[in-house]
Amino acid sequence: MNASEKLSQKAAQSVTRRFITWLKSPDFRKYLCSTHFWGPLSNFGIPIAAILDLKKDPRLISGRMTGALILYSSVFMRYAWMVSPRNYLLLGCHAFNTTVQTAQGIRFVNFWYGKEGASKQSVFENIMQAAKHPESGTRQK
């Protein structure tokens, strides 16, 4: 084992020791009992559900709900950054959710107004049709 490997091993041991010390501390128990931990943890259900929906038919995607979730997560990312102390778990949860919901939004737009709908109608025609008949859940052919 050379000198750099010994140094990196000592650094890893030091980080591990500090982490274990923190796990045993009253501060960690206080964190586990706070909404700073449980709120974001329970919030991770939303992006997990969105990931599971990535393989489903794009007809099932609600454009309004996807847009609302993108906006909601963007607002709460800002909140998680500005609150004191900063809530990095909440920030990560909402950054993850914004990313996944944006992917769902892209699938929605591509299906209803873009690539998949381009062969039948122009994007403009699809948008105008959706504006005239927002309650119709299927594309007119």
From Swiss-Prot:
The reply to whether Nucleus figures as a keyword in the UniProt entry is no
Its record classes its membrane topology as: Multi-pass membrane protein
Q: Which UniProt keywords apply?
A: Membrane, Mitochondrion, Mitochondrion inner membrane, Transmembrane, Transmembrane helix, Transport
Give the CC-aspect GO terms: mitochondrial inner membrane; mitochondrion
Query: What are the transmembrane regions?
Result: 31-52, 60-82
- Record has Oxidoreductase as a keyword: no
InterPro entries annotated for this entry?
Answer: MPC (IPR005336)
Q: Name one Pfam family in it.
A: MPC
Give GO terms: molecular function aspect only. Answer: pyruvate transmembrane transporter activity
Example GO BP: mitochondrial pyruvate transmembrane transport
Where found in the cell? Mitochondrion; Mitochondrion inner membrane
Q: Which domain of life is it from?
A: Eukaryota
Extract the PANTHER family matched here: UPF0041 BRAIN PROTEIN 44-RELATED
Subunit info? The functional 150 kDa pyruvate import complex is a heteromer of mpc1 and mpc2.
Family, as annotated: Belongs to the mitochondrial pyruvate carrier (MPC) (TC 2.A.105) family.
Write out the function statement from the record. Mediates the uptake of pyruvate into mitochondria.
Protein name in UniProt: Probable mitochondrial pyruvate carrier 1
